[in-house]
Amino acid sequence: MQIITEPCQMQAVVEKLRLNRQLIGVVMTMGALHEGHLSLIKQARSLAGTVILTIFVNPKQFGPDEDFHRYPRPFELDASHAKAAGVDYLFAPSPEAIYPEGFQTTVQTGAVAEGLEGMKRPGHFNGVATVVTKLLLITKPHIALFGEKDAQQLAVINRLVRDLNLDVRIIGAPIVREENGLAVSSRNIYLSKEQRESATVLFRGILHAEKELAAGRTDLAGIAGEIERMIAGEPECRPDYVCFVHDNDFMTAETAEPAGEYRLLIAAYAGTVRLIDNRRFTT
């Protein structure tokens, strides 16, 4: 595995790979690799001849009161995991390499990014869209894999690729969960034993929605309210939002229609750690 830190060097490498007709897959991360990331690498390995992993803690997607400086950066361990997983190139640029002095251009997102995470974290998705665009232009992949845990982010990236005619196929990969149902996340390391146990309420909320929809309920807002109360009833947790949206545009859905496609989105705090989860439902 080769570690590359300069964008120009990465671009030169992928140019040669493309000339040699190598199918390139990329997995973008902020490091602190976990089983979810490793599953993305494994899937990329099965689909592409060359796998690039990017590690970049993007300052432009963190708000002023968020955990940018606290975000875990175990680079040596990440590199070891990446090599063992079969990564060919690890691209780990510095913030100065991605955003050099005088950097001015940003990608502005649209309606799909306005609600939920976009409302709670102003500017977050513009930061995501900007860095994803840059990393796609630098790594020039044929396929790029992203986890479905960040469902709204995936929707933003899909819209970005369509709107800008970027020549890459975006693949969403299923959420990887711990044995207790908690969605795997780099931030889970901050959870105490008690908080980790309470945080399973997010998955229990999803199972509640699954049960109610299977029984024929259509009042999505009512189900969301029940899940919000479940979270509020946990001693270590408090809800941020619980909402059903139309899966194609992330607009709020109050009532389920026949043959509708919806996504339940949950954000909550366990202590000071913000967690998200989701599931897609077809009625």
UniProtKB/Swiss-Prot annotation:
Binding site for (R)-pantoate: 61, 153
GO molecular function, a single term: ATP binding
Single Gene Ontology BP annotation: pantothenate biosynthetic process
Main localization, broad class: cytoplasm
EC number: 6.3.2.1
UniProt-annotated location(s): Cytoplasm
Function in brief: Catalyzes the condensation of pantoate with beta-alanine in an ATP-dependent reaction via a pantoyl-adenylate intermediate.
Assigned protein family: Belongs to the pantothenate synthetase family.
Additional detail: The reaction proceeds by a bi uni uni bi ping pong mechanism.
Protein known as: Pantothenate synthetase
